């Protein structure tokens, strides 16, 4: 007895869907999935959390959720803002925090500072925990402190955060957006790297510490990429042509990273993906400013006030979440300008106030692989995006 045509069609569609699901899950499971920027350490210190507890609904990340999302390599950000007193001391506090997490969870995670250790962690099915300093102010204008952070396991440093250092200017400053005490900072500083900044880049090359050009101003970018003898890392940035946020890379910069042999890892922050979000966010902040002021006056901390307001107005937060597909528009632009060998993932989870749609926390990384499969990327190219490009740059920066 022959089946009716529509029944055969339905069965074939069902098998296609099952096959596609099995395909992306297999690719994701077999890949060494790397993310080069996560701020969970500073978030845990600020909020009194610990990484190995269940933080669902409180943060984007925790240990078990990273493992559930198939993450194999996570670079943890060692971060404080430019107002932090004794930033080098705070950096060491954050490093100590990660050390303690690893010590408590030896069967689930491993501290990694070399390609050989990364391979070992992956073979043992442990999260490879790496560290990157976010902001050159944390070395306090002292190369010996840079050396010390390297010796403690730090393997990249962004030359600036949003604030300038005495030796490098930031994207926020160079674009005229830098704020100080609630007002535009009019402090005059020559753009780019000064002589000490050049020494920092050269010292990082010598140590085997990746030079990270996220957050830096245009002139600092060009000074650093022209000085560096090693491939550059851009750990968490997107494309200016698609979303003109001052933190994003212009097309000539993207091309230059490709020529340098470096990698640009995509940031998930909606305001860097979607050009409409910045205006929405400003309206949201202004609308709730009095409410936030009252909460802080009542004794709430800044982050607690933000969390309370966000919890009261979930629809407004949802309206600021960039469409998932925009991440892949940025990815494709980098591929077109620099090549498939020069793009990866640096989500900035727990360093961003809200996420894009779909990518609500670290368990959603498989959705990236699923979409790459749907868009027709080959298994080889997906592996490059998820793992190979960052690992190649990491290896290329090692001292022979």
PLM segments and residue spans:
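Bacterial Sec-dependent N-terminal signal peptides
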Residues: 1-24
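N-terminal hydrophobic targeting/anchoring segments and the immediately downstream early-domain regions
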Residues: 21-187, 240, 244-400
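Loop-centered beta-sheet repeat module
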Residues: 189-237
């Amino acid at each position: 007895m022959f089946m009716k045509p529509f029944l055969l069609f339905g069965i074939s569609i069902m098998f296609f869907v099952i096959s596609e699901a099995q395909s992306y899950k297999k690719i994701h499971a077999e890949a060494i999935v790397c993310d080069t920027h996560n701020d969970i350490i500073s978030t845990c210190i600020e909020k009194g959390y610990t990484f190995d507890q269940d933080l669902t609904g409180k943060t984007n990340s925790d240990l078990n959720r990273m493992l559930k999302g198939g993450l194999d390599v996570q670079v943890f950000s060692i971060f404080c803002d430019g107002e932090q007193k004794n930033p080098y001391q705070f950096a060491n506090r954050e490093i100590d925090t990660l050390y303690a997490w690893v010590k408590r969870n030896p069967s689930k995670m491993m501290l990694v500072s070399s390609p050989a250790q990364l391979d070992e962690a992956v073979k043992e099915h442990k999260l490879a925990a790496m560290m990157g300093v976010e902001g050159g102010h944390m070395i306090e204008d002292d190369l010996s402190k840079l050396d010390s952070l390297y010796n403690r396991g730090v393997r990249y440093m962004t030359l600036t955060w949003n604030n300038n250092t005495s030796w490098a200017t930031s994207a926020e400053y160079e674009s005229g957006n830098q704020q100080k005490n609630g007002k535009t900072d009019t402090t005059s500083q020559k753009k780019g790297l000064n002589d000490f900044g050049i020494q920092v880049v050269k010292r990082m090359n010598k140590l085997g510490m990746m030079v990270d050009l996220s957050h830096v101003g245009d002139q600092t970018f060009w000074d650093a990429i022209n000085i560096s003898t090693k491939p550059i890392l851009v750990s968490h940035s997107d494309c200016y042509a698609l979303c003109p946020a001052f933190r994003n890379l212009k097309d000539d910069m993207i091309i230059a990273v490709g020529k340098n042999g470096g990698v640009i890892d995509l940031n998930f922050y909606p305001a860097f993906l979607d050009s409409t979000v910045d205006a929405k966010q400003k309206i949201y902040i202004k609308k709730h400013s009095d409410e936030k002021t009252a909460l802080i006056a009542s004794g709430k901390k800044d982050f607690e006030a933000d969390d309370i307001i966000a919890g009261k107005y979930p629809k407004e937060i949802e309206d600021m979440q960039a469409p998932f597909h925009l991440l892949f528009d940025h990815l494709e632009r980098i591929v077109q300008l620099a090549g498939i060998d020069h793009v990866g993932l640096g989500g900035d989870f727990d360093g961003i106030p809200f996420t894009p749609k779909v990518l609500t926390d670290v368990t959603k990384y498989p959705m990236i692989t699923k979409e790459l499969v749907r868009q027709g990327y080959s298994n080889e190219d997906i592996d490059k995006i998820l793992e190979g490009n960052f690992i190649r740059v990491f290896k290329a920066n090692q001292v022979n």
